[in-house]
A protein has these predicted regions:
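Intrinsic disorder/low-complexity segments in short proteins, especially the signal peptide
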Residues: 6-7, 27, 36
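Small-residue-enriched, tightly packed secondary-structure blocks
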Residues: 38-242
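N-terminal secretory signal peptides that target proteins for export/translocation
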Residues: 1-19
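Sec/Tat signal peptide C-region and signal peptidase I cleavage site
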Residues: 32-38
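Intrinsic-disorder/low-complexity coil detector
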Residues: 1-3, 33, 110
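Bacterial N-terminal signal peptides
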Residues: 21-32
């Protein structure tokens, strides 16, 4: 009799523990899913703004089709924030796309999200915002970026993009274009680190993918503004190839 009652008691405790655990999981999901959805909307907004930044720079002729055709990859960073006074910080993120094929001579890949951050030196009181487009000009710097964190100015040499020609485009690892308050200029991200934003890539594609998986793979299909970026860049390949 005592054994039967003890068994019933244990079963009751087990059921309560199960339902408590299940309730905790449901509550956690209810808290996480809205945040996940909100973050995904931010990712999609970043892609939308990246489309605008790249289109503006191409339309302005700041980035010539001839120089773009020499690039292995392009990293678009809309709205990079710099903050502080004297020595401050910077941060932003955006999509990286690369030419397909072993020699980076094919069409453009799906976009992989990357982040940029680090210290900045200057007299910006409060904060400033700059749009950047970075052209990665050789396989060495592409491999560095795809394989992990890359520090600008240390791991890769960067030069101002405006004024670069197809002949001089290969002199630097990275050509940098910047736009602050509508003014185009060749500006530096010296000291900033570039690395993959794995969380954003998971939200955009629904599975765990590295930056290398996305831009060097062939089975990753972008949608919406991600596909619009690919289409825009591919359209420049019709008349200007490597």
């Amino acid at each position: 009799m005592l054994r039967t009652e003890s068994k019933k008691t244990n079963e009751c405790i087990a059921r309560k523990a199960f339902f408590f655990s299940l309730t905790a999981i449901v509550v956690a999901l209810l808290l996480i899913l809205p945040a996940f959805g909100a973050d995904k909307k931010k990712d999609e907004e970043t892609l939308r703004r990246a489309n605008i930044v790249l289109q503006d720079m191409l339309n302005s002729k700041e980035i010539s089709p001839e120089v773009l055709s020499k690039a292995d990859c392009v990293l678009i960073l809309p709205d990079v924030k710099k903050f502080g006074f004297g020595v401050g910080g910077m941060g932003g993120r955006g999509p990286l796309l690369c030419r397909r094929g072993q020699k980076f001579e094919g069409k453009w890949s799906a976009p992989a999200m990357y982040s940029v951050g680090g210290a900045s030196i200057g007299l910006q009181a409060g904060g400033t915002s700059t749009d950047f487009v970075l052209l990665l000009m050789n396989e060495k710097v592409v491999n560095q970026v795809l394989n992990g964190k890359t520090k600008m100015g240390t791991d890769a040499t960067a030069a101002a993009g405006p004024g670069a020609t197809a002949a001089s485009a290969s002199d630097a690892d990275i050509l940098t274009y910047g736009r602050a308050k509508g003014v185009f200029a060749g500006v530096s991200l010296g000291g900033a680190s570039v690395e993959p934003d794995n969380d954003a890539n998971y939200r955009l594609y629904g599975k765990t993918l590295t930056g290398n998986d996305i831009v060097r793979g062939t089975d990753v299909k972008p949608s919406g503004d991600g596909q619009a970026l690919v289409t825009m860049l591919d359209s420049k390949l019709t008349t200007h190839g490597k």
